[in-house]
Swiss-Prot record:
Induction: By hypoxic stress. Binds 1 metal ion per subunit. Binds 1 thiamine pyrophosphate per subunit. This is Pyruvate decarboxylase 3. Transmembrane segments: none annotated. The gene is PDC3. Homotetramer. Mg(2+) binds at D80, N107, G109.
Length: 202
């Protein structure tokens, strides 16, 4: 009991959350590969972008999606590095009183960038992410945050988010920095090899 939470266990529980009234937003990074394994119920929305590899896009997308489809409860999966790029949009999400669920996967760095080309620039300052959202909330309106470190924590947080909270639910998932999907490892090595090619003479 209370063993460290693995990302594949997170997505096992996420699968059970999905209904035709849900929508999934997958941030650039390992969330791409984990969300692609989900089996979407009929009617469940799904948004991701891979063409440009733009990190941080999902927070703005999470703001926009419910504005156009307010019958869906949107569930977003965002890495800590990506979140730091566009985190301020949470303020507008709160002002618009949206009831989305954010799973913030805190593994202490830009995992996708590490797999492509490692270096000290991929180390980020760790935030207290739940504290950050609580500060933006500032006691005005409705918001609920939780920090989870084990499967037991996770199941309790999901039960609360789905059962009691018709507001923004922000669940910070503490994950090990090396807890990475094999798909990301394979993809990162291919991109790294492509980036290492000599220039094509014109």
């Amino acid at each position: 009991p209370n063993e460290p939470l693995r990302v594949n266990v997170l997505f096992k529980h996420v699968q059970k959350m999905l209904t035709g009234d849900s929508a999934v937003i997958a941030e650039t990074g390992d969330s791409w590969f984990n969300c692609q394994k989900l089996k979407l119920p009929e009617g469940c929305g799904y948004e991701f972008q891979m063409q440009y590899g733009s990190i941080g896009w999902s927070v703005g997308a999470l703001l926009g999606y419910p504005q156009g489809a307010n019958h869906k409860r949107v569930i977003a999966f965002i890495g800590d590095g990506s979140f730091q790029v566009t985190a301020q949009d949470v303020s507008t999400i709160l002002r618009c009183e949206q009831n989305s669920i954010i799973f913030l996967i805190n593994n202490g760095g830009y995992t996708i960038e590490v797999e492509i080309h490692d270096g000290p620039y991929n180390v980020i300052k760790n935030w207290n992410y739940t504290g950050f959202v609580d500060a933006i909330h500032n006691g005005l309106g409705k918001c609920w945050t939780s920090k989870v470190k084990s499967e037991e924590d996770l199941t309790a947080a999901i039960e609360t988010a789905l059962g009691e909270k018709d507001c923004l639910c922000f669940i910070e998932v503490i994950a090990h920095k090396d807890d990475t999907s094999k798909e990301l490892l394979e993809w990162g090595s291919r991109v790294s090899a492509a980036n290492s090619r000599p220039p094509n003479p014109q």
